[in-house]
C-alpha cells in the first residue's frame, strides 16, 4: 500500500510553491497541509522534528525544501512499493 504524500506548506513560502508545482507537473497526487494557518498541521510538522517548510512526507521518507533530485528519488521509490 502506497501512502499519499503530505506536503506541509506556509502561505508566502516560495519554496512551498515550487514543490507544489513540481508535484502537480509530474501528476503526483498529494495532500497539502498549511502549517501557518492550521494548528493541527503545525503540530504534525513539529512532530517531524522541524518547523520549516516545505516538507514533503511519504511514509517514513521526507524531503525538506525544493530539491528536485531528492523529490524524484522519494516519489519514485514510493510508487514502486507493492
Set out the residue ranges of the language-model regions.
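Structured beta->alpha junctions
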Residues: 11, 34-37, 60
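Local sequence-structure signature of Cys/Sec-based thiol-disulfide redox active-site neighborhoods
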Residues: 1-26
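Generic recognition of short, well-ordered alpha-helical segments
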Residues: 17-18, 43, 69
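Short active-site oxyanion
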Residues: 4-6, 29-31, 60-62
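Surface-exposed charge patches
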Residues: 21, 25, 43, 54
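Thiol/disulfide oxidoreductase modules built on the thioredoxin-like
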Residues: 44-53, 64-65
Amino acid at each position: 500500500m502506497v501512502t499519499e504524500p503530505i506536503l506541509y506548506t506556509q502561505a508566502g513560502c516560495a519554496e512551498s510553491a515550487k514543490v507544489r508545482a513540481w508535484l502537480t507537473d509530474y501528476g503526483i497526487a498529494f495532500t497539502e497541509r498549511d502549517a501557518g494557518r492550521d494548528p493541527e498541521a503545525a503540530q504534525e510538522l513539529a512532530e517531524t522534528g522541524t518547523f520549516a517548510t516545505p516538507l514533503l512526507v511519504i511514509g517514513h521518507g521526507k524531503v525538506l525544501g525544493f530539491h528536485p533530485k531528492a523529490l524524484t528519488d522519494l516519489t519514485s521509490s514510493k510508487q514502486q512499493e507493492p
